[in-house]
Design a protein with these regions (language model features):
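Signature of multi-pass transmembrane helix bundles
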Residues: 1-9, 13, 17-25, 30-180
Length: 181
């Protein structure tokens, strides 16, 4: 009946049916990276688009290794969430610090605004690349893991511990107690 027809249909068209999932949940960390960057930019009085793109670049720098001539998307889904959080906060804070302390390239007022902005962000881009990329390379050469793998291995015990009935009961209890605080 219907179940058999659906099974045949879904197995025939599986790539097309999974496309919406892959373009949303499969790219979740890219949205998280840009969103955190834009939010932190607003808090620090910076341009949200520039900061969001800077955070996206920092995440992709450590979480998108090239394998067989293509970018691996392994950490673009749920596996890369912690890495997206950490790299976005790092990139946004580095950019805010450099901007606050006027460590940017200043061009004369005659230069068009768009060109001046692209040069303004050059030093933060260099600082982020020159800190995150060597860290990722050092980690990969010493442990065989890139940053997202290392972060996941550090968080794995916490995730495993929270995946139990006592942990869920404790979480609900804490929420209920803190609701009244």
């Amino acid at each position: 009946g219907f179940a058999r027809a659906w099974l045949d249909f879904s197995s025939t068209y599986q790539p097309q049916l999974l496309l919406p999932f892959q373009l949303s949940m499969g790219l979740m960390t890219l949205f998280i990276s840009v969103g955190i960057g834009a939010s932190l930019a607003r808090q620090n009085g910076l341009d949200p688009v520039t900061t969001g793109l800077l955070c996206l670049m920092s995440f992709m720098l450590v979480a998108a290794p090239v394998k067989d001539g293509a970018i691996s998307m392994q950490y673009f889904s749920g596996q890369g969430i912690f890495t997206a959080l950490i790299t976005a906060i790092y990139a946004a804070e580095v950019y805010a610090f450099l901007k606050r302390n006027n460590i940017t390239i200043k061009l004369p007022p005659q230069v068009p605004t768009g060109v001046a902005r692209s040069f303004e962000v050059l030093i933060p881009v260099l600082v982020i690349i020159l800190t995150l990329h060597p860290l990722n390379l050092l980690l990969e050469n010493s442990t065989g893991m890139i940053l997202p793998e290392a972060i996941m291995s550090l968080v794995k015990p916490l995730v495993a511990a929270s995946d139990s009935l006592p942990a869920m009961l404790l979480a609900v209890l804490v929420c209920q107690v803190l609701w009244f605080a």
